[in-house]
A protein has these predicted regions:
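Terminal helix-turn-helix DNA-binding modules in bacterial transcription factors
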Residues: 196-236, 256-274
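Short, Lys/Arg-enriched, Trp-marked, Pro/Gly-tolerant hinge/linker segments that flank
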Residues: 95-100, 119-126, 136-182, 195-207
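Short hydrophobic/aromatic patch on the recognition helix
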Residues: 53, 189, 238-239, 243
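Residues within helix-turn-helix
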Residues: 176, 187, 223-225, 236-237, ...
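Aromatic/histidine-rich interaction motifs
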Residues: 87-110
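Core residues of bacterial helix-turn-helix
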Residues: 182, 231-232, 243
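The short coil/loop that forms the "turn" connecting the two helices of the helix-turn-helix
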Residues: 184, 233-234, 249
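N-terminal regulatory/effector-sensing and dimerization cores
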Residues: 2-93, 120, 124
Length: 274
């Protein structure tokens, strides 16, 4: 992407909840602003509760999942990784208690939405300028946040494991291979991951692989055998069994359903509404 863009959490799902609820990453920076409800995020393997007036900053290529809950509503601003507006180089979860700060960020989001919806000349430049303003708001908010306690050994281990998953999920490396790289046993890694994320070490890796697979299946026309090879599966048959086991559907069924969903007038209308 070349310009900042804003959308609702529903739009960020692109018609499929798994796009947010499975472990994955974005090629761009993202700032999530919750305005209603209560959800759960797992960021770099650490589980966090996300509530109203919470801001979640996700630098590009940060592994995360987000479940906003049935009543959750929020807005997302995606910024290009190469954007001139400075963004933090680590994930942040901020609870914005100051009413003025809450109103300021909401106003920036609403201004960006208006520009996108009106599609006037030079609207992309205006949205980028508002994204720069959002960056200033963010840095000011960071100054007023209480200092975070130093991460413990368990959290550092899980974050390092999440980084390895994100870097090597399209390879043949197993959870045991990553544990060996980190200098711990698979049992210890599993125990720590489950305590901090609610998921085992193997489940974190599986979710990331599944997201990558479903994205290529549903958003591309590549042959299934090619996708299997790109993601480090030993064969197309094993890839198909993996998808069937975790989704209950074959890769071809998933692709057909995704195309039908995109072609649906209801889905098209939902993508247009903010």
């Amino acid at each position: 992407m070349d310009h900042a863009t804003v959308m609702t959490l529903v739009q960020w799902m692109h018609g499929a909840e798994w796009r947010l609820t499975l472990q994955h990453s974005c090629p761009c920076h993202a700032l999530v602003w919750m305005t209603r409800g209560q959800g759960v995020a797992v960021v770099e393997g650490v589980r966090r509760g996300i509530g109203v007036h919470n801001a979640l900053v996700l630098p590009a290529r940060t592994m995360f999942s987000l479940d906003p809950g049935k009543t959750g509503f929020g807005l997302v601003c995606e910024m290009p990784a190469q954007a001139t507006a400075p963004m933090p180089d680590r994930p942040l979860h901020m609870r914005i208690r100051d009413v003025m700060g809450q109103n300021e960020l909401t106003a920036i989001f609403e201004g960006m939405q208006r520009e996108q919806n009106d599609a006037r000349p030079f609207s992309e430049e205006v949205v980028d300028a508002q994204a720069a303003l959002m960056s200033v708001w963010l840095r000011r908010a960071m100054l007023s946040q209480p200092e975070e306690p130093a991460s413990g050994a368990a959290e550092r281990l899980v974050r390092a494991y999440a980084a390895l998953i994100e870097r090597h999920h399209a390879s043949t490396r197993s959870m045991a291979d990553h544990a060996r790289t980190l200098g711990v046993t698979p049992t210890h890694l599993t125990r720590v991951c489950r305590r901090l994320s609610g998921l085992s070490a193997a489940e974190l890796l599986t979710e990331r692989s599944l997201h990558a697979a479903r994205d290529l299946i549903e958003a591309s026309d590549r042959p299934m055998a090619q996708i299997a090879a790109e993601l480090g599966f030993g064969s197309a048959a094993y890839f198909s069994r993996f998808i069937l086991h975790h989704t209950g559907r074959t890769p071809s069924d998933l692709r057909s359903a995704a195309r039908a969903r995109i072609a649906s007038p209801v889905a098209t209308a939902a993508r247009q509404v903010i």
